[in-house]
């Protein structure tokens, strides 16, 4: 197959065309069915987490080890010498790029991954999250999970709940699903955490249906995917947070009118926004979603680092 992802930076989901997304999803399914433990043998990949992470970092590292590659790097940028010495991000990336075949980066500054790509000496950059901006590999595993559970990425009704203003996962997911035809979006959030206008304007420009709703109950019988996110306490004043915490919680009783095919996703960590009782329903899919991150990240790593694939 033609591999247009070879040596490509994975900075934003917007950098990937629909056919490239489909290429990653097909490769993800292939690797889930048939492991390829030596696919990236002799490759060395840097894992540079300037911001703390558990799931994303461990998922990437597991993907790397299962492909036979080696990994170097750090998991807490605040405790490494380059931060204490005041070295710039660009200098750090320039040096690290001379050691490795690719760099995974998470950084609190928006735009940091694209900046890193300018100084990586043509070594591919994988964005593992840059501030509130983008988280493309989370989106790839989300798409893989949606396709796996719904057998399609078109003609879906998707409800997205929680922090839609600062949540980079929901921005990337909406942009990705907008590449596929006839999807509809239902946005549910506190007024202070509404989806940014640039996302709404993008949907309007593409003539894609979207609407704000006040609660999950209003739309539970209409949706195929319920994508929950946590509301961060520091984003709201105490009164707003108390109201949001009670209003935007998914309880098992709400699911009585759900479609049989409906699945609940969450980028994790889950705090209070999904009751533990929901875990035992057939709709709960967030832990299987997290497990799919290994296959999606294996797929994108291998497609970027190896030109020819069967």
Curated annotation (Swiss-Prot):
This is Aspartate carbamoyltransferase catalytic subunit. GO terms for cellular component: cytosol. Heterododecamer (2C3:3R2) of six catalytic PyrB chains organized as two trimers (C3), and six regulatory PyrI chains organized as three dimers (R2). Keywords: Pyrimidine biosynthesis, Transferase. Carbamoyl phosphate binds at residues 55-56, 106, 135, 138, 268-269. Catalyzes the condensation of carbamoyl phosphate and aspartate to form carbamoyl aspartate and inorganic phosphate, the committed step in the de novo pyrimidine nucleotide biosynthesis pathway. GO terms for biological process: 'de novo' pyrimidine nucleobase biosynthetic process; 'de novo' UMP biosynthetic process; amino acid metabolic process. Belongs to the aspartate/ornithine carbamoyltransferase superfamily. ATCase family. Pathway: Pyrimidine metabolism; UMP biosynthesis via de novo pathway; (S)-dihydroorotate from bicarbonate: step 2/3. It comes from the Bacteria. L-aspartate binds at residues 85, 168, 230. Its EC number is 2.1.3.2. One of its GO terms (molecular function) is aspartate carbamoyltransferase activity. Gene3D superfamilies: Aspartate/ornithine carbamoyltransferase (3.40.50.1370). It catalyses: carbamoyl phosphate + L-aspartate = N-carbamoyl-L-aspartate + phosphate + H(+). Pfam families: OTCace (PF00185), OTCace_N (PF02729). The keyword Transferase applies.
